[in-house]
């Protein structure tokens, strides 16, 4: 235990001891001086802080200081009633401060109580309640704002974590202050009751036990009690003032003194007006110019000084700003910063700004946060922050999505319309602006809100603009997810897996497979929309086969077969037949014969007429399935699967190509078409 911790514990024990153990008057005097000093230090600290959280210990400190002050009250009361003395400090405040006049002392004490209890304490208590309520109410909004800034790339993950912690600390602090302000209120009430008890029982004890007359007892004990009351209420008043400063303090870049002088005297012209008013007050009233003249002159001089220094500061700021701009242009770092490319960028025209502006009801930022979470669960990949910005070069209603600086999607939105898609494309039952749904290329119409209900009743799928663009972003990120996983992202996934499966990771990397080898396998899986969330199974497979080969194509095939249950669930519905298009024996033989083996790996080399024949056959089968509104899935034998995919990828990028080993044995498969040559 450190010395600081020990000193605090000893202090608390001494405070408790004050309640039960009689202390000599000289020790009480020292403790009273310490009490006043602590109260003054707390007040000065609150005035010097820039935000409330810089003094987050204040609620607990307030409790300890209140307990300390009440312990002093109990000890001084015991000393006054038992021995008729309260120590040098109490006697000094009773005689010197109030001039030895009991009535004056009582009046001063009552005024202090009124100031503390009715003015400062009551106000601080109310402000604490309101601050706590509004802080708690604002928490969800602040959290959403942090997520939006993180999603827009304005802050890093570390900064977002720090801000979230700060929001939580603010809520805890103001919640604690709401309760701690009751200590101050209770302390003021206790001070009044203690003074009344001291006076009444002091007179009784003086008369019955010490043989004093009622006048002597009243004078002696009232003087000591008033001194004790004032000496305890002064630090109490300082603490109450500190409480008020803490709960009313807004976060700023300077302390209280800096902010007061900076804001109160921010407009020198107003000081001239105040100086003239004070001068006129002395001229036209009996107050006299001798009293008002010096103050008016001081205000006028201050206004002149502030005005002059303000102009000089503006000139200096302009010069420094110009120099900074020149230095920035000359700096090589300013050019280097231009080389940075954001992984994902979403740009939109000025007409779509309401989509991203929360003040105008836009929730695009929140939707993108949800998209990143959804894709993390679905793909097993942490999607980078999406940089969102408006682009004046685009049409007002136009947007585009870039991945690593390359445009991958583009579209237009009508914010005051809804996108309606008919279940049967040939239907034309509602009026609207003809368009194409951007995510899946379906025919659609932009309809006004007036016909939205009618479209719903007719069976149309009606979607708002924000949902349209969110779906478009989601599908395009899925389509290009393999471009977003590099070696750095792969290393992060490996490190995360290593926390739970260190032995497995050590068996795979750095030997026999490098981070680059693993990255290629993960990218190939994502390219065919296979989730990499099950990293344990993927690494188990790589551990088994990585010793045999480092060919990323072969490792990917082994991994796909290990993920058979996942792939089956992705394409086959439970208790339903999986309808597929199969490859004929001639097609598979032609592809197998066309595989060329080299020292750098295998590749497919087919005669142009054979390739063209296979592509035409696949196109024919896909068209027939499309007319029947069925999904096309191509099934072939394991040895040729990856070569079939390579052949068809250019023409049918979204066509799933599966092998028999990638489907579980309990899945019923039905061939509804054959690819032949």
UniProtKB/Swiss-Prot annotation:
Transmembrane regions listed in the UniProt entry: 6-22, 27-43, 52-68, 104-120, 189-205, 230-246, 275-291
Species this protein is from: Bacillus subtilis (strain 168)
Biological role stated in the UniProt entry: Involved in the export of flagellum proteins.
Entry GO terms, CC: plasma membrane
Family according to the record: Belongs to the FHIPEP (flagella/HR/invasion proteins export pore) family.
Lineage of the organism: Bacteria, Bacillati, Bacillota, Bacilli, Bacillales
InterPro entries associated with the record: FHIPEP_1, FHIPEP_3, FHIPEP_4, FHIPEP_CS, FlhA, T3SS_FHIPEP
Any single GO BP term: bacterial-type flagellum-dependent swarming motility
Compartments in which it is found: Cell membrane
Pfam families given in the database record: FHIPEP (PF00771)
Keywords carried by this UniProt record: Bacterial flagellum biogenesis, Bacterial flagellum protein export, Cell membrane, Membrane, Protein transport, Transmembrane, Transmembrane helix, Transport
Topology versus the membrane: Multi-pass membrane protein
Protein name: Flagellar biosynthesis protein FlhA
Xref: Gene3D superfamilies: FHIPEP family, domain 1, FHIPEP family, domain 3, FHIPEP family, domain 4
Gene field: flhA
